[in-house]
Amino acid sequence: MEESILNAHNKEEYPPMHTAEHILNQTMVRMFGCPRSRNAHIERKKSKCDYLLDACPSEEQVQEIERRVNEVIAQHLPVSYEFVKRGEVPPEVDLWKLPDDASETLRLVRIGDYDLCACVGTHVQNTSEIAPFKIISHDYIADTHTWRMRFKLAE
């Protein structure tokens, strides 16, 4: 394939947190059937993600999200990249957040057999590089069906 051209990325990310966010997104998709986060703010110390949900998850569900994310992290899955043309993206990859001016060549990030997502961000090479995941708070805005979760990685 010819040399790939990617859109410029506008921020420096903390790879363990960014990869944890991908695992969290796939966990939410699997547990609730919702889209990946509609809004995310990923930082080294703590991060947040917003999800469109019909109801606020119960405390048991919140604990289960945390447990499942940590279970995936503990599997020591490889993180790999592949470059594909937009028309060749597998159907399970959601492109709704892709900007209109995105290049024709996309980079897909694969976390073992757990997640596959178009992304230009930085990631770890293996989930063994991610510290345990902890949900630190969450709230639900009924008017917009938005569940906001704040999380961190153990230090």
Predicted regions and their residues:
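Active-/binding-site microenvironments in catalytic and ligand-binding cores
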Residues: 1-155
